[in-house]
Design a protein with these regions (language model features):
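RNA pseudouridine synthases
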Residues: 1-302
């Protein structure tokens, strides 16, 4: 479905399908569904014509609730902190765009991040209304991200990841470990943990796999850490962090594994002082449309 509202400053309208329920008006639903959004904000959006249905019809405080209807609106943030690091575009053609993401920058809007996201920055700068990430990196991870530029060919590139046709290489800094002979392959069953933003490994059929090799020792200032090369064969959330932690070599500045660490809480005076030492160094694949072998590498280092 095409959105009936335009993209503004790189921000696409959000949408919400109306479920079955007891509400008489759309405003009643919005007030209950989004209790943290003040009613005055919804009324303001309505007055500006920035809350519409799937046909582009403006909604108001008395608009009747329709099960199955789709409403569109723009997310707004009262304030949004600037992220003082720039992305780089490594490649672009009529089908794909490849970006080199800095640490701390989310890929897509969520929570307290809207304009300061890789997607919105790129859409605004390059005027690419159909731009969509084909895969994701965590906000804390830097490195290579592949985007689809053309909706008509997007499925070819999402299929590459779904069918594990993309070769991914990560680099990580973690403690040196002499009792393991590298390279080693870690397989485990990863499920959602507690709190909700953590994952955990449990006994069960493996649903994740990573090949890990050890490289040279890092500079002395890194406290004897070692550089590791990680090749994930699957893409579970926090997979690399969990697998490294499970081997007894948690990635530096992780803060989530093996335990939730308050000691690594972000410094309020400098929230960017301790980036996670994890970098999506490269991706490579055979282009599904022209058969060319592509290799894209981040210029960033840990």
């Amino acid at each position: 479905m095409n959105a009936p509202l335009p993209i503004i400053d790189g921000v696409s309208p959000s949408s919400h399908r109306l479920p079955a329920g007891h509400w008489e008006t759309i405003l009643e639903f919005l007030k209950e569904r989004f209790p943290d959004v003040d009613t005055a904000i919804w009324l303001s959006r309505m007055a500006k014509g920035e809350l519409v249905d799937e046909m582009g019809l403006r909604l108001n405080s008395g608009s009747a609730y329709r099960v199955g209807a789709c409403i569109f609106y723009y997310r707004e943030l009262e304030s949004e902190a600037s992220i003082p690091f720039d992305e780089r575009v490594l490649y672009q053609d009529e089908h794909i765009l490849v970006a080199d993401k800095p640490h701390f920058l989310p890929v897509i809007p969520a929570g307290r991040f809207l304009h300061e996201t890789l997607l919105v920055r790129l859409k605004k700068k390059w005027k690419l209304e159909q731009l969509v990430p084909v895969h994701r990196l965590d906000r804390e991870t830097a490195g290579v991200v592949l985007f689809s530029v053309n909706a008509a060919t997007r499925g070819h590139y999402t299929a590459l990841f779904r069918n594990r046709k993309v070769r991914k290489v990560y680099e990580a800094l973690a403690p040196a470990l002499s009792k393991i002979s590298f390279p080693v392959t870690r397989r485990s069953c990863i499920v959602r943990g507690e709190p909700f933003f953590r994952m955990k490994e449990i006994d069960g059929a493996p649903n994740s796999e990573t090949r890990i090799d050890a490289g040279e020792k890092a500079e002395a200032s890194m406290g004897g850490a070692r550089l590791y090369r990680l090749n994930p064969l699957t893409g579970r959330k926090h997979q690399l962090r969990l697998h490294m932690s499970g081997l007894g070599i948690p990635i530096m500045n992780g803060g989530l594994y093996p335990e939730l660490s308050l000691a690594l809480a972000v410094d309020s005076e400098d929230p960017f002082s301790s980036p996670l030492k994890l970098l999506a160094k490269s991706i490579s694949f055979e282009d599904p449309l022209n058969g060319r072998e592509y290799y894209f590498q981040s210029s960033r280092t840990l």
